[in-house]
Structures are given as structure tokens and as C-alpha cells.
Amino acid sequence: MGRLLDFYATQIRVLREWQGGPVSLLKRLVITLVVATLSFLATAAVLSSRMTVDRPRDAALAVFLMALFNAAIRPVVLVFAAQISLVLTGLLVLVLQVVAFLVVAQWAPGVHVDGFVVALVGSFIYAIINTVLTGILGVDSGGSYYGLLVQRLLVKSAKGHSDQPGLVIIQIDGLAHPILAGRIRAGSVNTLASWIREGTHKLSRWEAILPSMTSASQAGILHGNNDGIPAFRWYERDRKHLMASSNPADATLIVSRVSNGQGLLSNNGASICNLVTGDATRSYLTTAAIKAEGGGIGDSQAFRSFFFSPSGYLRSFTLFLGELFKEMYQARRTRRAGIRPQMHRGMKYAGMRAASNVLLRDVNTSLIIEEMYRGTNVIYADFTDYDELAHHCGPERVESFEALDGVDRAIATLAKATEEAPRPYKFVILSDHGQSLGETFKQRYGKSLGETILELMSGRATLVQTTTKAEGSTFVNAFLSEITSSQGVGPTVARAALKNKTTDGVVDLDADVEVPVSDPSAIAVVGSGNLGLVWFTGNDQRLTVEELEELHPGLVASVAAHPGVGLVMVRSKARGAVVFGPKGTRYLDQDRVEGEDPTELFGPHTVMSLMREDAMTHAPDLLLLSQYDPELGEVAAFEELIGSHGGLGGPQTEPFILHPIEWELDEEIPLGAPAIYRNLRRWLESIGIPLGAPKADARTTVAEETAPRAAVVV
């Protein structure tokens, strides 16, 4: 009984706080009652004679009675049912809604519901209409949903309060420093802007080096080491295998290579929606941990809370449909306006966008709140909303900015949730890289990079080419993989529906192509933004430029002379790493230039980045950067994404870090992701959170050095 009384007391207090005080709460209750009444009348109209309402005031009384029923009965039943079975919780939600409709039919004058089946259908129709109207009128932006989660977590939590702060690190995937600064000046991203203007946080910039993409950046940020990762995908000659950062088995291997046991999350930390783990104690939607035993969102109270709210899943489903139709409208508008650059945005992408902007954002936010109420030391979560939109629409288009505002609202929700958490939390917001705009290589020249190289070889090879998925699809796969590995009716249905897309328990909606290693003439061409990599898979060792000239005369010179190529790096047996450009050559090992320096256009860290790539064990036979227009900051991606990253040129190498004002960076502009690890580690130690013990065979991480090194050991 005491626990139940605590539940009601907490429910009332949190409800008041999450709705902005008594006046705001009263105003919202009145508006909610009006919207609910209209929804009830609309439901009766849809069901016609099988559900009737005599007068509008009868509908108002009915929804009021339903609200009382849900407030009084639902918590009593479900707060205990959720501890027993997720399936039981979900079923009880449906049953209670139907019972509420039947109770209303008995007690509310002027209301008639024709039996259980009509009540079942009516409860769904009512919830959908109410959710749509609420969303259109802006009555609730998620406050009730997250407020309910906070209520449940507070009742469940038995921990006392601690004054030692924890740390929440939010990664806004793909957001460049200059774009964030521009949105702040434009009056957008109000939460982040208020932190800066109130003097609690400082906006700083850091510099990403090759490859400027998520797996390399996250390995550097979370583990302090991103050696041996030449791109999002790469070919390993010794294993005759195409590595993919989005593949759970490959991501697990990456972590085993870069981790020394002292990841940022190694001391009671949580990884949410990431590629690598950071040696986290708990991981959710994390690619490298999908196949790990135990854990995952199926064991999460936040996931259970989704079923606890009668409108929770209907809210998400309705918002999902809304985002789907919104994308269809915006894509059509872009086509009609003739905006350039643009790309095809079909239904597959629309579904991916809706999943990223609705489902993943909700799940991420809920999981972070749950970990805060668990008292977790450090939480690192990746929001891919903006990155997904920027890839397909452009990093500075209205669709991308709307996604960014959505992430900003999620951060506001998290900041509010800390008020009831068992410990205070500091926030660091950062990005892993930026994005650069530009028509793709194929849009400009009619052929992909692989097709172009094959043509220059007169077709004397078998082409296998692959490009990087946007991060959003990777984490949708992670979400589906964890759902299908959970218990319950929903996961069972999902497993059956995704059977043909599932291998060893891992869902992949767009499986990668494996290089046919049996074909000695195969060339593997990988595009990662405007970074292109080429391997001649029939050779066990990296080919030198001399060997390439003997096997394929004139190929390197022809590739370097292509108008869509900015530079090509190869290895020379006599002169080391050599970079060819359209009007000159740079010998990296000799620090010598003939003609115009092809590296100069791409910035001051290009030589260091290329030397680092050249030293990697799995370096490609040919490494390319596309053409680059410094005036517009545009590149020509070797994949079909008009907003891209992975290479050099433009804001793709200009990520940001927004940190508490009292925490100083050890450099004005940190260079490389391991430098961010070094700063975050120092900040954690300053608030009494040391990292875990190193592995017995751990190597020194890059972050323990003063600068990124050229030599790379895998």
C-alpha cells in the first residue's frame, strides 16, 4: 500500500512539474478535455450506429470518466504487471482501454457502445484520432509520455540521492560547427543556444581527420584509439573479407582491436545507439554489442513504459505515419522546385527517415532517462536524426534543420528529467564529424567511381563496389535486431516478418555484398563520402605504383586526370607514398612537390591524414579524394548521398563540442577524435569518475600521445 501511495503522490507532483506549473497544467487539462471530446465524437461518427453519443456534453463526461478510470485503475494493475511480463503488460493495456469504453457505456448518460468488439475497435480509433489532433494542435510534444516514464522510474528506484555528478554525452551525428553556430544565430536550437547565452556552456570546434566518419570518430572518442580503420568499409587481404562498421561481427572485431579496457564507459557507463561500445557496462542499440549475451532494450524499463501508456505505441505509430507523409510532400516539393543538388528519395528512404526521427529518437531519449534514474556514471548516446536527413536532403536544408530542432527538444527533455534523478548530471553535446554538400560523382559524370575505373581498365576486371549506409539505417537494423531477440507477441511477429532479412539473430534490411574472393580479377571499390578506396583483390599484398603500371598501364595517371578526382594516393616501391593530382605530384615521405601540390586544396592536415592512411595495414591500392570546390565547400561523393562525409573538403571535418564552461579543452582546436577522448577522460576524473582497469595485454592508446601518429598497428 505504501508503494501505491508513493506512486500516486509522485504521479501528481511530476505531472505538475512536467506541465509547467498549476496554471499551465489547468490550461492543458482544459484543452486536452476539448480535444478528447472531439476525438470521442469523431470515433462515434466512424462507428456509426454501433457507437452513439446523444450530445457533445455526454461525450465530454465520457472522456472525463475514462480519464478517471485510467488514472485510478491502470497504475494499480500495470505497475505490478510490468514486473511480471512485457506481454502481460501490453495485453492489459488493450484490455483496460476496452474496459474503459464499456464502463463509460454503462455509466455515462447518452453514450452507447455495442459490445466488446466495438469497444476494442473504438478504443484504437479514439487513440489514433486523439493522437493526431493532439499533434496538429501542439497540445503535447511528448511531455506526458516522458513524464509517465519518469513517474514509473521514480517509484521503482530505491536509490538515495548523491551529490556526485554524472555525465551525459549526446552525439548529434553529422552536425558541423559552422552549421550549429548558424542555427543559433538564426534563433533555432533554443536549448543549446540558451546554455551558451546563459554562460553554462561553451561552443568549441575540433578537427576530424581521415576518415571523417562515425566508426573511426567513435572509436577515437570512446576508446582513445582509432588506428586501423581506413574507412567505414575496407577490404582485408589476409582474410579476404570486406569489413563493414555496420556489421555487428565486424564492429565487435573493431572494438577488440582498439580497446585497452579503459573506454569512456568502462566504469558503470551506458552506450546507446552507437557503433562501438566504449567498454560500456550496459549497451543498447549498439552495433558491436548486438550479439552479446543479456541486456538490450528488451530488458529496459523504458521499453516497457512504451507499453505501459495506452497511447504510447499509437502515438509513435501516428507520428511515424505523419513523418512518412511529411517526407513524401517535402520530396515532391524539392523535385518541383528543381533544387540542386537533390537525389531520389523513395518510400524506402521515407520509412527510414520516419524510423530515425520518431522511433529511434523516442527510444534514445527514454533509454537515457532510464540510465540517469539508474544513477549511471556516464552515458553516451548518438542521435542520427540530423545526419540521416542531411545525407539525403543536404546539411543546410529545411528538412535537416527540422530534425536538428527535434534533437534539441529531446535534449531539453533530458535536461528536465535530471531534476528528479538520483544524482546531478553534466551535459556534453558533440558531433563526430560534419557533412559537405555536393552533387555526387555519378550525378556529375554519369558513372560511379567503380564503373569509371573499370572503363579505364578496358573492362579487364570484375567489379564489386559498395557504398556506406547512412548511420540511420545501421541503427534501425540494431533496433530491429534487439526487438526480434526480445520475448513477447510483438517480437515474435517481428521475427516472422523479418525472417528473410535476419542472419544469426541480426537484422539487415540492406545487406552488404561480399567480395567474390575466388575471382582473381575482382576489384573492390568502396565509397565513403568523397573518400574512395580501391583494392585489387587477387593480390595478397598492396600493389605499388610500379606494379600497377605494369599490370594496368596508364591507369593511375588516367584516374588522377579525371575531372571528378582531386587526388590519388599510391605506394611507390622507390619513393614511398605518392600523391598524384591533375597538375602536380607530392611525395609524402620525401616532403617534395613537383608542379602544383594536390594536397594543398584540402587543408593543412591533409598530408598528415594521408600518411596515416598510407601506414595502415589494410591501406588500399588506390586512395582517392574527389574534386573539391573551396568557394562553395562542395565535394563529389563516391556514393549516392548529396550530403556526405568520410573524406576531406568542406565542413565534413569541422565537428563541434559543447561543454560546461568550467571545463577547458587542452587545445584551442583539438585534432583528431582521440584528443576528444583525452579531454573527456580528464573531465570525468575531475568529478571523481575514473575509468576501468586496463586489459592485461592493453597497448598504449593514441590519446595518451601528444598528437595523432602516422604509424598504425592493427
Each language-model region and where it sits:
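Juxtamembrane/disordered regions of integral membrane proteins
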Residues: G2-V117, V132-S141
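His/Asp/Glu-rich, glycine-adjacent segments
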Residues: G142-S144, G224-G394, V526-F536, D540-L543, ...
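Acidic, His- and aromatic-enriched active-site or binding-groove loops in soluble protein domains
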Residues: H223-E236, G296-F303, I368, F401-A412, ...
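Active-site nucleophile/metal-coordination loop of metallo-enzymes that catalyze phosphate/sulfate
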Residues: G166, H177-S309, A461-K499, T503-D510, ...
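Short secondary-structure boundary/capping segments
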Residues: R183-S188, A289-E293, G394-S400, L437-I453, ...
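Active-site neighborhoods of enzymes that stabilize oxyanions during catalysis
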Residues: K240, S246-S259, N268, N274-D279, ...
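Metal-dependent active-site segment of extracytoplasmic phospho-/sulfohydrolases and closely related
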Residues: D408-G446, A577-F580, L625
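A long, amphipathic alpha-helix that forms part
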Residues: V358-L359, V363, E371, I379, ...
